[in-house]
Amino acid sequence: MESQQLHQNPHSLHGSAYASVTSKEVSSNQDPLAVSASNLPEFDRDSTKVNSQQETTPGTSAVPENHHHVSPQPASVPPPQNGQYQQHGMMTPNKAMASNWAHYQQPSMMTCSHYQTSPAYYQPDPHYPLPQYIPPLSTSSPDPIDSQDQHSEVPQAKTKVRNNVLPPHTLTSEENFYTWVKFYIRFLKNSNLGDIIPNDQGEIKRQMTYEEHAYIYNTFQAFAPFHLLPTWVKQILEINYADILTVLCKSVSKMQTNNQELKDWIALANLEYDGSTSADTFEITVSTIIQRLKENNINVSDRLACQLILKGLSGDFKYLRNQYRTKTNMKLSQLFAEIQLIYDENKIMNLNKPSQYKQHSEYKNVSRTSPNTTNTKVTTRNYHRTNSSKPRAAKAHNIATSSKFSRVNNDHINESTVSSQYLSDDNELSLGQQQKESKPTHTIDSNDELPDHLLIDSGASQTLVRSAHYLHHATPNSEINIVDAQKQDIPINAIGNLHFNFQNGTKTSIKALHTPNIAYDLLSLSELANQNITACFTRNTLERSDGTVLAPIVKHGDFYWLSKKYLIPSHISKLTINNVNKSKSVNKYPYPLIHRMLGHANFRSIQKSLKKNAVTYLKESDIEWSNASTYQCPDCLIGKSTKHRHVKGSRLKYQESYEPFQYLHTDIFGPVHHLPKSAPSYFISFTDEKTRFQWVYPLHDRREESILNVFTSILAFIKNQFNARVLVIQMDRGSEYTNKTLHKFFTNRGITACYTTTADSRAHGVAERLNRTLLNDCRTLLHCSGLPNHLWFSAVEFSTIIRNSLVSPKNDKSARQHAGLAGLDITTILPFGQPVIVNNHNPDSKIHPRGIPGYALHPSRNSYGYIIYLPSLKKTVDTTNYVILQDNQSKLDQFNYDTLTFDDDLNRLTAHNQSFIEQNETEQSYDQNTESDHDYQSEIEINSDPLVNDFSSQSMNPLQLDHEPVQKVRALKEVDADISEYNILPSPVRSRTPHIINKESTEMGGTIESDTTSPRHSSTFTARNQKRPGSPNDMIDLTSQDRVNYELENIKTTRLGGTEEPYIQRNSDTNIKYRTTNSTPSIDDRSPDSDSTTPIISIETKAACDNTPSIDTDPPEYRSSDHATPNIMPDKSSKNVTADSILDDLPLPDLTNKSPTDTSDVSKDIPHIHSRQTNSSLGGMDDSNVLTTTKSKKRSLEDNETEIEVSRDTWNNKNMRSLEPPRSKKRINLIAAIKGVKSIKPVRTTLRYDEAITYNEDNKEKDRYIEAYHKEINQLLRMNTWDTNKYYDRNDIDPKKVINSMFIFNKKRDGTHKARFVARGDIQHPDTYDSDMQSNTVHHYALMTSLSIALDNDYYITQLDISSAYLYADIKEELYIRPPPHLGLNDKLLRLRKSLYGLKQSGANWYETIKSYLINCCDMQEVRGWSCVFKNSQVTICLFVDDMILFSKDLNANEKIITTLKKQYDTKIINLGESDNEIQYDILGLEIKYQRSKYMKLGMEKSLTEKLPKLNVPLNPKGKKLSAPGQPGHYIDQDELEIDEDEYKEKVHEMQKLIGLASYVGYKFRFDLLYYINTLAQHILFPSRQVLDMTYELIQFMWDTRDKQLIWHKNKPTKPDNKLVAISDASYGNQPYYKSQIGNIFLLNGKVIGGKSTKASLTCTSTTEAEIHAVSEAIPLLNNLSHLVQELNKKPIIKGLLTDSRSTISIIKSTNEEKFRNRFFGTKAMRLRDEVSGNNLYVYYIETKKNIADVMTKPLPIKTFKLLTNKWIH
């Protein structure tokens, strides 16, 4: 039957997965594997070995089963899943027999997929799919697929069948894949498929047929199990499961690459060089090999490459081995230069050598210069070869006198070594430096030298030594001239005597010459003969004429040597030898001064510029150049730090043919962020190709018009000033250059626009390098001067002026000289940022000072004046009326510049600038210290509690951790916004005021979170895109910025005042980022609940959904294009859900008796807007909800710079009793302060070691802390926190791996004293932890939801605590800590084993540890999108670090979990919750009263009663209670606040404490206070009397209502569904900058579980738009809570949304889109429609008077406030 089907359908070709090809094997000209000839025998042996393991049954062609081959059982081939091979059809044994499957017995059940499209093949005809089983392959030369598509017949030509093709073995591991591919390709070749296998280039000889394709696919699948394939193969097959040939092609290419790598390594290891080929050829060969390895991700270090090269050097190059033997920092380029120089010298000497020496020379002279890091050292090597193998015996002493040369003026030295070698003393000129260098002629092999010995030379008429150390009575040489045997001069530096003291006490002295230009010290026998001393070479001794032995001589190599131990050292000064007159350096300008004045240019440029007279009025001889080449400027090191240089030679050669100013290079840099609007954000630079003249122009944007104006200006300038026309401008392909406007501009003026090629920025090297240079200078100048960042372009302009005036290393002239301009007048230049006093020609009063402090920037372009920055006026002026401020204290304070106080030198250079100011302005130092417990004295008695280790007590010197800062104000500067990490500018080093960033929102209790644009500062969580949030990263210490900031993030705390995030930021390991001032964080196990915990607050502009867990809420199918209008009300069960059912059981006010004075709906009126905006903390601009007029009106606001100005010249106009200026005042602008609120510092709640123990005068408390200390030590040792077997030396450990540690102490609410040993994670190096690890705690919404569900379902609530939780988590990194202070081991370290509290990774390690245990051992699952919420069928767990809250219907289920936890962790039961009566809990700061099946009350009465009185706020001053936290109509005055510096810090600190505590309380349960908390939090930096009074009023209201509780009652048991409702409201335009306030309240089954009040992130233009914004912010969190409720309680859920804006509901329900005013409004409304419809959300109207969310958006009258809150807070 099957054969008939095949005959009827010739297109359905069949193939077998195991069948042999019955055709002639196709030969291949090139092996695609490129296997070398040496590897082929091994390959054949492996193949033969495999073949030998398979036995062939006689009489058949079948191959029996073997272990290399797929088992015939069906289970041997794993079923495809998760991207494995697709399985369309299975081959059964019967089908296999029917299809002539004879060769491999019965195969396993094989898959046979339909053909899919592949890059190398054609798509088959869909009418003829592949069959479900494949017959044997029978064609040898089938037609390609093309012919089959034309319905042609399959060729029937048959060739000889190969019946015994051995299959490849089965792939056994991923590592053996490439070896298996070799066998598999050999198998395909033997199966006559070699011509369709692609080579490494992807080329094939012919197209395959369907039959061959199926054959290859099935055999590959059979012998290569999917799970054993490499990842890259799986990725290919997941895209196209049948694309086997692509896999083979890439495998061949990778194997060829591996083969080439092996060849390159072999070639590199076997390098040899003897000079027979050119050095350039050798260098190219080696560099090519190294480059190929680098392209294959194999980096060969310079040291390894040099070692391999040195190993292969021979001949004259062999000496380099000894030279580099001791070097550790070998450079490959340096070694190549050495080899090249030796090669060139040999080549020259071979050409110059006389013919009689070319054949019979005994000497080969090689000279080589060796670079050195300190000085230049020239070493000459003379390789001496004798014709005799015998040692060279010294001649008799009388032979030396037969020299043909005069001993006085023309002494002859034989076999000497000559070259120039300088002394190592950097402070003195070297010996012989004025002598000419002789050409080396004769050396001895360096291997023959005997250290610390003199070579005895019978042919030398003079004794020569290299060191003056042994030279007595030395005098500088002025007349003696020595030559060697080749009559080459040897420079002599000094003449003296060598004093010998031989072993029998004989002393003698001989004349000696000093020269450093020889390789060895030579001792002349002739000189010894003059002292009656001879050398006996038979007995190897020095003897007197009477036979007395004076000293032994040593034979070493071919020569005899005398030890230098018989020489008497001299004690002469090198000054007497050098004879250098150093008096010339007197009155010279120090080089660091010139370096600063000339814009921190490099040494060579400055020196060359002075030589070429590019700088006038200053000569090269006027500068002290000693050590100038090695001078390291700290500012240059910081400002000019770079990764790598641009590639040299990237510029094309033909560009050099242009004339000056005909060829320009241009590029744009920017933007620079966080600058005032007046400061440019970009600059565009131009460089002339010929002269290298540079121009820079500032830009505020990159618009076409701005760029065009600059080009017009530069072309006109060049034409008029230099009489030249620009022909070509080279640019990159940025859109600012490639636009039509600029292209037309170039075309009209005949200018050629030359663009770089795609992705070839290196071709634009001239402009790129200029930008890099200018930015290096900019960073350096700003860092050196300490000027604010908005002056960055002034630094660039100053750098341009200097660079145009200096000679570059590649040019002989400066750019100005090339352009025909005069050199730079040095008298017109001041150091950038030089303090000056500017004359004020128009003072406000005749008695005011006439001088204004300023800072010099750069010479003016438009006048002969100077551009000077005046911080007090916040502007720059162009003036000549200035004088340099001569004040040593006004110099740089970043470094200790002993040589940079150049008042006298600067006066000489700028004498004409001195005029009218002579006073100095004194300054004080500014310090910052960071210390730990190890600086304090330990008073712990070791006998109080036995410890595991033998700890010894050691006292330490007590130091005070906190030092009161002394403010140092160098000048009056404005404060710029913080520069992002991508900015080029450094932070101002002297900024004494907080950096301000706009952060403006509070969420659920006044959450104030960072909202920076930098990724590392991101702290928001968007539910729609699932961004994980982070805690604020950069908190400002407004009270004491100069104190130590700690960021002990792993101490378990909670953010107070704001929606607690379910995830922590990327760089942290816990949910809190502490950076405390003057303190360390709380260490209470439930520190958020600690009695003295003060919250961290941060202002944010994100919406509520940004801080809630993200749930996948993608819309369902209805969002397809055929659904034009979404349904507002869901279809299912909509008939059962009504507005009444949604409103039922909600705690809404009862309005049956409406009061005539009720003003709860006043917010819907539209009063007239006042012309003057009044920013109110309690109600906005005019009324409780002020709206703009109906007519559109443009609103313009003054640009208020976000700064806090320090004004020194502000006079007290109210009191003129004294003409003395008052103390420094802070002038605070309201809008700037509101925009500047970024974070609030937590108040320290813990004690340091010295406070708790060392200096604690309360002996009882001290004893308790000591007891807690020992308890903590024992716990640490019991948990094996560190390695107790070994102490490590600090000097042996990488400092990055060392973490400082300290003890912190705290008193918990229950009265117990707690000690905690923590690591200083705030100073932990980033390389020591993984920033991607997440540390999570339960979200407060999740806790409230769980509590609500527990009440409705009568759950038991069990509270647990795990002691020392972090110490159960192992640490992966290698970290070390300092031992506890009582051990006294300050110089030792301990190796950490566990995740110590304080480490950045500890929280993440603990989270992963406990999560894994709960999932694997307790059968729990984490709820998706809600971290730290775990559940199974019976129990729900909320995890907050080491606190666990268990909810279950069955108490036994809780106890089962507890039993499992106790097996692994020290678990304490805080409250089992078994009682049926009222149970009191203290859960994460909430005081909860719970009676199952009845009610639950949440409050904080005890905590507030204890904490509020400690805030130093007068409570109940008038003896009556407040009824509301604030009243409408109270506005904050906009007048600037002028306040003393110290008073300002004190008041800001007070605001931090008050608002912080209020935010914490509001976040937990007092949602009715959120609006007031949020608004006051925005005024933390504006602590006026009015703001403080309003804050006191809020605290007073909290005190009066401290007994209020959030009351929940059990839901009616008749309700079959869970009902989740969000109530939304917005107050339009009642915040600064016309921002709107939005608020939402969330209720589950009628119980309020959360609330949010925040300023809208966008400026809304109408009331409706504000309401839409509020609704859109509520929906994501509503959806996420819905998912959580459904996970925790399987009942159906109804979601409702209530708003008092009928227009918003109308827009959601309307199908008319023409009413939308603009695209933004329309897209937001349409998105809202989709979200409402797609999430089964019911939207209903609620009366304004019943809208309890009204309290979140505006201040309300007392009656209205009570009416809206008394049903849920009472």
Curated annotation (Swiss-Prot):
Subcellular location: Cytoplasm; Nucleus
Catalytic activity annotation: DNA(n) + a 2'-deoxyribonucleoside 5'-triphosphate = DNA(n+1) + diphosphate; Endonucleolytic cleavage to 5'-phosphomonoester
Motif range (Bipartite nuclear localization signal): 1193-1227
InterPro entries for the chain: DNA/RNA_pol_sf, Integrase_cat-core, PolX-like_BBD, Retrotran_Ty1/copia-like, RNaseH-like_sf, RNaseH_sf, RVT_2, TYA
Entry GO CC: cytoplasm; nucleus
Function field: Capsid protein (CA) is the structural component of the virus-like particle (VLP), forming the shell that encapsulates the retrotransposons dimeric RNA genome. The particles are assembled from trimer-clustered units and there are holes in the capsid shells that allow for the diffusion of macromolecules. CA also has nucleocapsid-like chaperone activity, promoting primer tRNA(i)-Met annealing to the multipartite primer-binding site (PBS), dimerization of Ty2 RNA and initiation of reverse transcription.
Name of the protein in question: Transposon Ty2-B Gag-Pol polyprotein
